[in-house]
Amino acid sequence: MALTAALKAQIAAWYKALQDQIPDFIPRAPQRQMIADVARTLAGEEGRHLAIEAPTGVGKTLSYLIPGIAIAREEQKTLVVSTANVALQDQIFSKDLPLLRKIIPDLRFTAAFGRGRYVCPRNLAALASSEPTQQDLLAFLDDELTPNNQEEQKRCARLKGDLDGYKWDGLRDHTDIAIDDDLWRRLSTDKASCLNRNCHYYRECPFFVARREIQEAEVVVANHALVMAAMESEAVLPEPKHLLLVLDEGHHLPDVARDALEMSAEITASWYRLQLDLFSKLVATCMEQFRPKTTPPLANPERLNAHCEEVYELIASLNAILNLYMPAAQEAEHRFAMGELPDEVMEICQRLAKLTETLRGLAESFLNDLSEKTGSHDIMRLHRVILQMNRALGMFEAQSKLWRLASMAQSSGAPVSKWATREIREGQLHVWFHCVGIRVSEQLERLLWCSVPHIIVTSATLRSLNSFSRLQEMSGLKEKAGDRFVALDSPFNHVEQGKLVIPQMRYEPTIDNEEQHIAEMAAYFREQLESKKHHGMLVLFASGRAMQRFLEHVADVRLLLLVQGDQPRYRLVELHRKRVESGERSVLVGLQSFAEGLDLKGELLTQVHIHKIAFPPIDSPVVITEGEWLKSLNRYPFEVQSLPSASFNLIQQVGRLIRSHACRGEVVIYDKRLLTKNYGQRLLNALPVFPIEQPAVPDVIVKPKAKPARRRRR
């Protein structure tokens, strides 16, 4: 489709009308360029897909929504906007699209949040009920569906009143009533515990109401995991050829795709025996009380017992083999080099893949049959069996995927990382098996790049070390296929708005010097805090261990610090805003997740402290396997893997400071390797251009760690 004059005029008119809706709107050349690039790509005028880096301040969300909606209407397609986190998804759904509706009055949009974000009305009814009989009936379905106390029951009753009165849409983030994680775990549900169409509450269930709205919507706001699953199953979203797809926070896409290729499951022999026995009894119950019209051959008791016995014997053999690789009777881990399993283990995995897939098929067959019996049997007993069969199906689905992945030598031309772990829980040993594909380009090519005609991949950060090469390698996007890669200029003047401070540290932040380095960092931070020049501060760490050591050094000012984990992130940010706006000092302290999606403008954040260059952990089985593979190809893991990842993290961390033209401040990085190592200049070159200062650090006396006493040999 060509971009007609009428279509261009429509996009221009909406953009002009938008300026009247936003106070202090500043027209920006990068934004106009992005609108044009997105329009040309989605209309098929230029290239296959577009990866476009839009720095903070460009206004990327509206830059893809305006042309996306216009072209979707012209082509009678659905615009799907996908994000990596709930916060951005909710911002687009609750803020950006309602704003556009003011200039596009008939705009129809909805959101497809994950099931776990919605309340389950069945669970809510049980927890809100003050009638013991009602609670007993629902507890028959699930033992946890009773309130812990009267206050919790009253809170649930208020939530139910809001839901029934259409004052609440059922999303956790859309109610002012406080819901702690434990309560929400019981209020929500997952696929395995959902009765689906068999549920009495199906028609008014917020999750299914939202799913039905997708069919009528022009714009659907989803998340990457849902989009990947939808492309795999061809469910939830319209057909790929009828989509226009925007992947915001697109740098997360390879990780999300990798998660779909990541399987972990318990394989402890005794636990497995229990699951197989429970499933056999469940099948017997179905045959006795809810006999299907056509009996699956495997439902025959003798055949099923023989099948389960073979599964158990294979699992027991695998446990015995894995125990040879790990120290006896203690927590341990064993990784298989390059993901290569011994022949005997590979044969077991291949056989288990077939056997567990057969059990998955049997569970699915019974579940489909049970779903058709709701009008002819005791509804409570039937629902209980449906729930149990649903959970069995989920377990065998996971096991089937695990053994199928374990049986693969490679995925997307790279090894599959494989390892086993042994944990001790309540005095009992538990064995787990894990598999992760380290490359996912073939999966993305099959599900996205070859299925959806035109896709926009965007983020404030897509490059590392000033290059798209890492994104290309991880995602499979390539110029040879007609994909375009564009990096927009920042609208901000970083030279005037901020500076980069690299204190003259005596120690490098290596593991051997961690104690001394953190003591120096704490001393400089304390000096900055006491100067009272900055009311809003952010401190970012590469590890939880380092963060805790830092907190020990500044324990006397702990009340000023809002630390990740103390409360949900949104509450910490809310409290930070209130403190700064009332003239108080406030310091947010967190890990890498606080370096993304945190938008604090002006006085809310004028100083960012970064503990060190955040290289990926060297003890991760996935990272180690990837390193082995790269070396086998005569590629240098530090250049291909570690340095690009560190550059990406540093760009995101530094990007927290300048969020608008009104922002002023400084970024403090406590890592002298930026100035002393050859790679340091490359990392600096990938950052916005700030003037650099190197102040002295206060003298610190650090007590050396006591070395453990050597045992005298006897």
UniProtKB/Swiss-Prot annotation:
It holds the Pfam family Helicase_C_2. Residues 17-294 form the Helicase ATP-binding domain. ATP binds at A54, P55, T56, G57, V58, G59, K60, T61. Binds 1 [4Fe-4S] cluster. Its EC number is 5.6.2.3. [4Fe-4S] cluster binds at C120, C194, C199, C205. It catalyses: Couples ATP hydrolysis with the unwinding of duplex DNA at the replication fork by translocating in the 5'-3' direction. This creates two antiparallel DNA single strands (ssDNA). The leading ssDNA polymer is the template for DNA polymerase III holoenzyme which synthesizes a continuous strand; ATP + H2O = ADP + phosphate + H(+). GO terms for molecular function: 4 iron, 4 sulfur cluster binding; 5'-3' DNA helicase activity; ATP binding; ATP hydrolysis activity; DNA binding; DNA/RNA helicase activity; metal ion binding. A motif (DEAH box) lies at residues 248-251. GO terms for biological process: DNA repair; SOS response. The keyword rRNA-binding does not apply. The keyword Zinc does not apply. Belongs to the helicase family. DinG subfamily. Type 1 sub-subfamily. DNA-dependent ATPase and 5'-3' DNA helicase. Unwinds D-loops, R-loops, forked DNA and G-quadruplex DNA. This is ATP-dependent DNA helicase DinG.
